[in-house]
């Protein structure tokens, strides 16, 4: 079986192929929300998180996430910086204004000068520049949630 993996994952071995029905790992590591307008990237992150034991919720825009209200009880959020209408940073401001406190991991292909400082001012918990390894994202999730890093199944 051959899988196409977005270029944002520098190591395609970190994105496992979907498992046959009935053989998935139990999702016990918590709910992680993904906000990414690039469908292939969003699906790759969702597969990675699922294989690591997370329940992943996916959204193609900040507006979709905010309308859903799912951020209120998420373990953390992984969001692209550049989204169609509301940026990842603006979304985080709105999440905080609503009193929700999940940590946000910001991913971006535009790691411009001053971005890290701006991200810190907005309360971003971690920033990953694309392309990144799947293991780097799992490490960031473990770091911002204060939990041990879940592993990927052998194979």
Language model features with spans:
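Charged docking surfaces used in two-component/phosphorelay signaling
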Residues: 43-47, 51
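C-terminal output helix
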Residues: 114, 132-141
């Amino acid at each position: 079986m051959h899988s196409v993996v977005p270029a944002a994952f520098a190591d395609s071995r970190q994105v496992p192929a979907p498992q046959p029905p009935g053989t998935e790992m139990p999702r016990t590591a918590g709910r992680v929300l993904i906000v990414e307008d690039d469908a292939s990237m969003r699906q790759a992150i969702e597969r990675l998180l699922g294989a690591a034991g997370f329940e992943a919720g996916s959204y193609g825009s900040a507006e979709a996430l905010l309308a859903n209200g799912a951020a209120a009880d998420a373990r953390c959020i992984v969001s692209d910086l550049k989204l169609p209408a509301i940026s990842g940073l603006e979304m985080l401001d709105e999440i905080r204004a609503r009193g929700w406190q999940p940590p946000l991991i910001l991913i971006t292909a535009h790691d411009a000068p001053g971005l890290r400082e701006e991200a810190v001012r907005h309360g971003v918990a971690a920033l990953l520049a694309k392309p990144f390894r799947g293991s780097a994202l799992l490490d960031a999730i473990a770091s911002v949630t204060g939990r041990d890093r879940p592993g990927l199944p052998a194979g």
